[in-house]
UniProtKB/Swiss-Prot annotation:
GO terms for cellular component: CCR4-NOT complex; CCR4-NOT core complex; cytosol; membrane; nucleus; P-body; protein-containing complex. Component of the CCR4-NOT complex which is one of the major cellular mRNA deadenylases and is linked to various cellular processes including bulk mRNA degradation, miRNA-mediated repression, translational repression during translational initiation and general transcription regulation. Additional complex functions may be a consequence of its influence on mRNA expression. Involved in down-regulation of MYB- and JUN-dependent transcription. May play a role in cell differentiation. It comes from Homo sapiens. It is found in: Nucleus; Cytoplasm, P-body. This is CCR4-NOT transcription complex subunit 9. The modification N-acetylmethionine is found at M1. Keywords: Acetylation, Activator, Cytoplasm, Nucleus, Repressor, RNA-mediated gene silencing, Transcription, Transcription regulation, Translation regulation. InterPro entries: ARM-like, ARM-type_fold, CNOT9. The gene is CNOT9.
Length: 299
């Protein structure tokens, strides 16, 4: 850790007074008395300060202060007593961690320190109250920012953790927004070759993913969401790239994806329509013979 004096310089586009303010707020994170306001101000400014992440990471005690904010609310998780005020405060800390997670200069160190694991207790929560929903969504946002970078090290790290079952649970029972971010994270893991191989490595893993995606399709046929459906279809399409998964999907792909159930929802979404057509084509083509030598019956 370095002192603030050696932190990465802020581009000169920021006025000198703003730069001094940023330094002041970062210093104020170290003190419990001034931390809450500093969290609020820095989270508001995070979009306009391109190098905020290195400044946070390399300044003394800052990351420890952000982690303290997270750990402080663990007792409010079970039993679930989290208030709106507590939720807003910790979500400001999470917003700053998201900034560190998505910056190329700090992402590797962020993973090496295993900081995402501090957020997993929040993803385990099931309370439907607004403070908890906001907490889950913001925590998912940090993981979403990591996978958005399409970096192999991110996927390798996540596969050593319980992120897939956590995402699957939120995909099954979260709010529409949380479901969308959780499905996006799963999609990004699947789009990586290591991630696809990991999920298709055992029948248990694949069947868990396929079961949840199937439930989501059923739910989406009753309460359509074009944005969520797009991610679900992309997950199915990517699974169909794996020969073993493709065979299984021939048996378990929901009928709603084969008929006109979603025609109205997708009428203006050419990308998802193309993915869906490709998925159906993949499942129809190249029916391989069973390794035991018995030809598989045509579907």
């Amino acid at each position: 850790m370095h002192s603030l004096a050696t932190a990465a310089p802020v581009p000169t586009t920021l006025a000198q007074v703003d730069r001094e303010k940023i330094y002041q707020w970062i210093n104020e994170l170290s003190s419990p008395e001034t931390r809450e306001n500093a969290l609020l101000e820095l989270s508001k400014k995070r979009e306009s300060v391109p190098d905020l992440a290195p400044m946070l990471w390399h300044s003394f005690g800052t990351i420890a202060a952000l982690l303290q904010e997270i750990v402080n609310i663990y007792p409010s998780i079970n039993p679930p007593t989290l208030t709106a005020h507590q939720s807003n405060r910790v979500c400001n800390a999470l917003a700053l961690l998201q900034c560190v997670a998505s910056h190329p200069e700090t992402r590797s160190a962020f993973l090496a320190a295993h900081i995402p694991l501090f957020l997993y207790p929040f993803l385990h929560t099931v309370s439907k109250t607004r403070p908890f929903e906001y907490l889950r969504l913001t925590s998912l946002g940090v993981i979403g920012a990591l996978v958005k970078t399409d970096e192999q090290e991110v996927i390798n790290f996540l596969l050593t953790t319980e992120i897939i079952p956590l995402c699957l649970r939120i995909m099954e029972s979260g709010s529409e927004l949380s479901k969308t971010v959780a499905t996006f994270i799963l999609q990004k893991i699947l789009l990586d070759d290591t991630g696809l191989a990991y999920i298709c490595q055992t029948y248990e893993r694949f069947s868990h993913v396929a079961m949840i995606l199937g439930k989501m399709v059923l739910q989406l046929s009753k309460e359509p969401s074009a944005r969520l459906l797009k991610h679900v279809v992309r997950c199915y399409l990517r699974l169909s790239d794996n020969p073993r998964a493709r065979e299984a999907l021939r048996q378990c792909l929901p009928d709603q994806l084969k008929d006109t159930t979603f025609a109205q929802v997708l009428k203006d979404d050419t990308t998802t329509k193309r993915w869906l057509a490709q998925l159906v084509k993949n499942l129809q083509e190249g029916q391989v013979t069973d390794p035991r030598g018995i030809p598989l019956p045509p579907q």
